[in-house]
């Protein structure tokens, strides 16, 4: 005998239809639209960046650009009377929004999940470097996209620390900052304890070139 197909109740039909509709919506969504948390910089992250940048009440020139407060871009004539630390803090927080958006967009575009302290480390890099490191062909960005867990501590530290040049020159202050950011990214430590575990070698060509 051939069995008749089981009849579905109306509630079951509605549940099945809803489930199929939801599955279709999820299938049509791009990968970056799936749930990825967005972040803002933590209080600890802000303090760390301010420590890196140092405070200047008046505008100063660095590498052809003008800055004030905690390393915030400005025009040389913007603040003729200088600014207070409180004003500098607000200027930096306003500027951080741009860096936060850049990092959040990277995370959403590639469905990358990170912790708060990893986000803070990337925002610190972006505030200092701009977006130049956010290129998939560059190591750190590529590691994030392909899965940072696949790489060793040394590989991650080297990928971050390579961003230590001003022009063609290595700056020790940038090396130290990158090592702090790398340690924060890996271990969530906002203080200066970790980078003592790292050693770097700076080759000087003494007038020649290093290959």
Describe each model-derived feature in a short phrase.
Residues 36-57, 72, 86-89, 93-94, ...:
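Long, amphipathic alpha-helical surface segments
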Residues 79-110, 114-134:
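Alpha-helical segment that forms one wall of the substrate-binding/catalytic cleft
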